[in-house]
Amino acid sequence: MARVKRGNVARKRRNKILRLARGFRGGNGTLFRTANQRVMKALCNAYRDRRRRKRDFRRLWIARINAAARLNGLSYSKFMGGLKKADIRINRKMLAQLAVIDPKTFTNVAVNSKS
């Protein structure tokens, strides 16, 4: 059986991991074995949190809309139900921005959803 010479393959693989680990503290950024563990964990966290971010922002928007709706005498569910009945199609992100940036406009939307 012929001898297999790997050349630069192993070094390239290790350097790729160390490049990804740049900026990590201590040996986590310089030693291959610990850097490899940290990089794998970091990539797992990034994958998980890309999905979690969508949930977190939706919760934040709902909390903001609820607070602004209660200032106008409505609960969140009544407010959203009123928007559906009035056929006002504004998504939660835009409603939350209105509540924070332009409360007068949000009040107008709330009045329309009441009627």
UniProtKB/Swiss-Prot annotation:
One of its GO terms (biological process) is translation. GO terms for molecular function: rRNA binding; structural constituent of ribosome. InterPro entries: Ribosomal_bL20 (IPR005813), RIBOSOMAL_L20_CS (IPR049946), Ribosomal_protein_bL20_C (IPR035566). The keyword RNA-binding applies. One of its GO terms (cellular component) is ribonucleoprotein complex. It comes from the Bacteria. PROSITE patterns: RIBOSOMAL_L20 (PS00937). Keywords: Ribonucleoprotein, Ribosomal protein, RNA-binding, rRNA-binding. Coiled coil: none annotated. PANTHER family: 39S RIBOSOMAL PROTEIN L20 (PTHR10986). NCBIfam families: rplT_bact. Binds directly to 23S ribosomal RNA and is necessary for the in vitro assembly process of the 50S ribosomal subunit. It is not involved in the protein synthesizing functions of that subunit. Belongs to the bacterial ribosomal protein bL20 family. This is Large ribosomal subunit protein bL20. It comes from Prochlorococcus marinus (strain NATL2A).
